[in-house]
From Swiss-Prot:
<dbReference type="GO" id="GO:0005829">
    <property type="term" value="C:cytosol"/>
</dbReference>
<dbReference type="Pfam" id="PF10509">
    <property type="entry name" value="GalKase_gal_bdg"/>
</dbReference>
<dbReference type="InterPro" id="IPR022963">
    <property type="entry name" value="Galactokinase_bac"/>
</dbReference>
<feature type="active site" description="Proton acceptor">
    <location>
        <position position="174"/>
    </location>
</feature>
<keyword id="KW-0067">ATP-binding</keyword>
<dbReference type="InterPro" id="IPR013750">
    <property type="entry name" value="GHMP_kinase_C_dom"/>
</dbReference>
<keyword id="KW-0418">Kinase</keyword>
<protein>
    <recommendedName>
        <fullName>Galactokinase</fullName>
        <ecNumber>2.7.1.6</ecNumber>
    </recommendedName>
</protein>
<feature type="binding site">
    <location>
        <begin position="33"/>
        <end position="36"/>
    </location>
    <ligand>
        <name>substrate</name>
    </ligand>
</feature>
<dbReference type="GO" id="GO:0005524">
    <property type="term" value="F:ATP binding"/>
</dbReference>
<keyword id="KW-0808">Transferase</keyword>
<comment type="function">
    <text>Catalyzes the transfer of the gamma-phosphate of ATP to D-galactose to form alpha-D-galactose-1-phosphate (Gal-1-P).</text>
</comment>
<dbReference type="InterPro" id="IPR006204">
    <property type="entry name" value="GHMP_kinase_N_dom"/>
</dbReference>
<keyword id="KW-0460">Magnesium</keyword>
<keyword id="KW-0963">Cytoplasm</keyword>
<dbReference type="InterPro" id="IPR006206">
    <property type="entry name" value="Mevalonate/galactokinase"/>
</dbReference>
<dbReference type="InterPro" id="IPR036554">
    <property type="entry name" value="GHMP_kinase_C_sf"/>
</dbReference>
């Protein structure tokens, strides 16, 4: 998708040419799953698939918004005077939520606009289409109203929309990965301190292949909130003896020595994943820095095993993709990415093997699950921008 095609779509819907066009990427997480609300590290990257928008300012307080991805919703309208969540406003609640949270900061928001949105992220795939939308709206609002918020501040507003406006217990990784994305760079983020460091994603003869189960996952309908509550309860029990604020404060040995305090087999497994995954993420960052791709791949594999055995968030579809990927030539590693329960996995695949990889994994998946998977080679991209 480019400026011209999006502008044409906008003109067909609103009968005038747009004033500006914007883009916001999606994201993958290389490693560090379910660590962001446990005070641990994550290692995500923005990708070239994402969400586009064409925009024109209005001289009143009205908003008219349309998404080519949700055509049945039609043109949705709302006013600056009523930014409360309304289920009838469908996807427009992402824009309303960003406006609602930014309005709390005494920023001048004095007019509405017309907006045409078209994304190429697969729906409900776990590639963060919601965070992509939030950061897209942040970029548009930044431009529309001359806001002085920096990228990290806008990222935090996006998380507030998820937590306060939608009532979801999500961490900050998705918004951060997108809002702070850099081309060909992954981001090691300490979610406890918000310290971050970029790492060149120099994979040489290898590429990241995204594998889509085509099984929809709904964050609010999944066991995401249950897993978070389990980790919080395990932490509370550890804190009866240990002076820690998060599970991410522990290393593997410290956890093993004190796991008896949790006194519940399921909670021990959940907490063990959080602690060990955090350490794997740090080791993976170190491996990439040293160009040790074999070690990086082994850590990626270990992450999926933990997400399956200790955290129980994978499921038959993701396990079929990942376990089949492990058996293919030219594969360094593979794991689920995102919240799980469907959605996507990633594999680090030698470029020369990609076509055969997709064919073999695709055949096994369709034979096993009964419907085809989709595959995309990930390009690591910059964060939100005006085109």
């Amino acid at each position: 998708m480019d400026f011209a095609s999006l502008a044409t779509e906008y003109q067909e819907k609103f009968d005038v040419a747009p004033q500006r066009v914007f883009f916001s990427p999606g994201r993958i997480n290389l490693i560090g799953e379910y660590t962001d609300f446990n005070g641990g590290h994550v290692f995500p990257a923005a990708i070239s698939m994402g969400t586009y928008a064409a925009y024109s300012a209005r001289d009143d307080k009205q908003f008219r918004v349309y998404s080519a991805n949700v055509p049945d919703a039609g043109v949705l309208t709302f006013s600056l005077d009523n930014l409360a969540f309304d289920k009838a406003d469908n996807w427009a609640n992402y824009l309303k939520g960003m406006l609602f949270e930014l309005a709390k900061q005494d920023l001048t928001i004095d007019h509405g606009f017309d907006l045409f949105v078209h994304g190429n992220l697969p729906d409900a795939s776990g590639l963060s289409s919601s965070a992509s939308m939030e950061m897209l709206m942040g970029e548009i609002l930044h431009a529309a109203y001359g806001m002085k918020l920096d990228e990290v501040e806008m990222v935090k507003v996006g998380q507030q929309v998820e937590n306060d406006y939608f009532g979801l217990n999500t961490g900050i990784m998705d918004q951060f990965a997108i809002g702070m994305g850099k081309k060909d760079q992954a981001i090691l983020l300490d979610t406890n301190t918000m310290d971050y460091e970029y790492a060149p994603l120099a994979l040489g003869d290898y590429v990241v292949v995204i594998m889509n189960t085509k099984k929809r996952r709904e964050l609010t309908d999944s066991k995401y909130n249950e897993r978070r509550a389990q980790c919080e309860e395990a932490l509370r029990r550890l804190q009866t003896k240990l002076d820690i604020k998060t599970l991410g404060d522990l290393n593997e040995d410290e956890f093993d020595e004190n796991a008896y305090l949790i006194n519940d087999d399921v909670l021990i497994k959940r907490a063990r994943h959080a602690v060990f995954e955090n350490q794997r993420t740090l080791k993976a960052f170190d491996a990439l820095q040293k160009n040790d791709l074999q070690r990086f791949g082994h850590l990626v594999n270990a992450s999926h095993i933990s997400l399956n055995y200790d955290f129980a968030v994978t499921g038959k579809e993701l396990d079929t993709l990942v376990e089949t990927a492990w058996q293919q030539p030219g594969v360094l590693g593979a794991r689920m990415t995102g919240a799980g329960f469907g959605g996507c996995a990633i594999a680090i695949v030698k470029k020369d093997n990609v076509a055969d990889f997709e064919a073999q994994v695709g055949k096994t998946y369709e034979d096993t699950i009964g419907h085809p998977a989709e595959f995309y080679v990930a390009e690591i991209a910059d964060g939100p921008a005006e085109l």
